[in-house]
Amino acid sequence: MANEEQSNTYSTESHQKKSFFQSLFGRFFQGELKNREELVEVIRDSEQNELIDQNTREMIEGVMEIAELRVRDIMIPRSQIVFIHTDQNLDSCLDTIIVSAHSRFPVITDERDNIAGILHAKDLLRFLRSNAEEFDLMPLLRPAVIVPESKRVDRMLKDFRSERFHMAIVVDEFGAVSGLVTIEDILEQIVGDIEDEFDEEEIVNIRQLSRHTYAVRALTDIEDFNQQFNTHFADEEVDTIGGVVMQAFGYLPKRGEEITIENIGFKVTSADSRRLIQLRITVTDEQLAEIEKAEELKED
């Protein structure tokens, strides 16, 4: 009897899913979907009816979103690029590679916007077993692919696949280097963050750059920020310091925009079309003294 009830339940659920599936494809092929919003609604209905899971839904939406993004929205900003200079010797190049743990590096001349080429870290391996005096960087460089900030991300992905390269240098309207983009940056827009064996397990949300400046991830909890900087930002409406900054602006600010909140200077150093990513904050001497005093009290 129990087996019969279980069979009937399974049959009913299967029939419901089949009916929804037929309705879904009917809307596709009969041209009922008029815009992107309706398509997104259908995809989310598919998840609720268990035709697809959450990961699949997020990937489909990610594919749709990259068609609306420009390279400037996802690029690594120039300030975060690790460059190698044409006059570096072998030991200096190896030091840069070891510290950064990257596999590809833009190589520049004395003029920062003059890209000589791209160095692959693996191309230095043969020099580890030979005389370092034979090292000559220039012949090792591969041509750099240059793309404008305005290039569509879906076109960029197509070029990565068809031309079989993995990194491109991004330039602004004046030809100055503004960032770089990799195929991984695009794939992360579709499937989420991709961590490899070199990614840090523990993410540092607040990092001191100089006596008065700090790099702060926008996703830092307000409570953690308040504790670090002896501030009193409220967390009733937003949860992160990025939310506080957006609330103060009244809109999603772009990279380079600045604002002062509670006498602390905030500058957006990284952002895309959907969210803030990284901030740089500047504190005064008085605030720094309060921070240091609070640190001393914690230690006591």
UniProtKB/Swiss-Prot annotation:
Ranges where the CBS domain occurs: 75-134, 140-197
Protein keywords: CBS domain, Cobalt, Magnesium, Repeat, Transport
Cellular component per GO, a single term: plasma membrane
Keyword Magnesium attached: yes
Annotated SUPFAM superfamilies: CBS-domain pair, FAD-binding/transporter-associated domain-like
Known role: Plays a role in the transport of magnesium and cobalt ions.
Family in the record: Belongs to the UPF0053 family.
Protein name as it appears in the record: Magnesium and cobalt efflux protein CorC
Organism: Pasteurella multocida (strain Pm70)
